[in-house]
């Protein structure tokens, strides 16, 4: 029978001889490709329909089948399974906004049937011009009129606290002499206590 000390030694040797497990390698992440900045946006279904109708130049309008063929031939990466439903929505939107119009031959058609034409672009509303404020006229004429009206009025007498009255007189040369404009001269009147009024020139 082997001793317990030998068994413990053999176990320690077997543990020491066992190979060490290598740590699991981390999976490398593949770098994501950056998206191209400013890439061209895909055209809308309505814009593709308008381009197809204008390119075909049919006066009586272009049929839905012809428009579909043109879109598939001139646009890459289009999902054909979703194109039919997208065209129906685009036709309804175009008729509502006035971008697309039905000719007389297919006036009774509805939905994505019949033929279509490009409608006239709605005119952009012009901005209303601001009304110019009228310029204020110089008030020189009004001032001159008011001054002339004041001159024509008869002069008023003004009483002073001392009982002195002032009155303006105008003088003009006689008819035989030289003509001069009216001259205005102010006079002061004062009535003495016991006698007639005396005149004093200012």
Swiss-Prot record:
Which Gene3D superfamilies does the record cross-reference, listed alphabetically? Winged helix-like DNA-binding domain superfamily/Winged helix DNA-binding domain
Q: How is it modified after translation?
A: OE1 and OE3 are produced by post-translational cleavage of a common precursor.
List, as start-end ranges, the regions of compositional bias called Low complexity. Answer: 177-187
Keyword Nucleus belongs to the record: yes
Q: Where, by tissue, is this protein expressed?
A: Sperm.
What are the alphabetically sorted keywords of the record?
Chromosome, Developmental protein, Differentiation, DNA condensation, DNA-binding, Nucleosome core, Nucleus, Spermatogenesis
Localisation: Nucleus; Chromosome
Q: Where is the H15 domain?
A: 41-120
Q: Which InterPro entries match?
A: Histone_H1/H5_H15, WH-like_DNA-bd_sf, WH_DNA-bd_sf
Location of region: Disordered: 1-46, 104-202
GO cellular component terms, A-Z: nucleosome; nucleus
Q: Where is the composition biased (Basic residues)?
A: 1-35, 126-156
Q: Which PROSITE patterns match?
A: H15
**Pfam family example for this protein?**
Linker_histone
Give the UniProt record's GO annotations in the biological process aspect: cell differentiation; chromosome condensation; nucleosome assembly; spermatogenesis
Q: What does this protein do?
A: Linker histones are implicated in chromatin remodeling and/or transcriptional regulation during spermiogenesis, the process of spermatid maturation into spermatozoa. Protamines substitute for histones in the chromatin of sperm during the haploid phase of spermatogenesis. They compact sperm DNA into a highly condensed, stable and inactive complex.
Q: What is the protein name for this chain?
A: Sperm-specific H1/protamine-like protein type 1
Species name for this entry?
Answer: Ostrea edulis (Native oyster)
């Amino acid at each position: 029978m082997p001793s317990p000390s030998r068994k413990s030694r053999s176990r320690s040797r077997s543990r020491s001889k066992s190979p060490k497990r290598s740590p699991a390698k981390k999976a490398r992440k593949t770098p994501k490709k950056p998206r191209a900045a400013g890439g061209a946006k895909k055209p809308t279904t309505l814009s593709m329909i308008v381009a197809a109708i204008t390119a075909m130049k049919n006066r009586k309008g272009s049929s839905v089948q012809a428009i579909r063929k043109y879109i598939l031939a001139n646009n890459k990466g289009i999902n054909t399974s979703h194109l039919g439903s997208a065209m129906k929505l685009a036709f309804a939107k175009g008729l509502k906004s006035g971008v697309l119009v039905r000719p007389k031959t297919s006036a009774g058609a509805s939905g994505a049937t019949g033929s279509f034409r490009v409608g006239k672009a709605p005119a952009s509303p012009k901005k209303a011009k601001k009304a110019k404020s009228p310029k204020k006229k110089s008030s020189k004429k009004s001032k001159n009129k008011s001054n002339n009206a004041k001159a024509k009025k008869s002069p008023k007498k003004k009483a002073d606290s001392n009982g002195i009255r002032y009155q303006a007189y105008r003088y003009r040369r006689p008819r035989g002499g030289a003509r001069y404009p009216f001259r205005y001269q102010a006079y002061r009147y004062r009535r003495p206590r016991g006698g007639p009024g005396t005149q004093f020139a200012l």
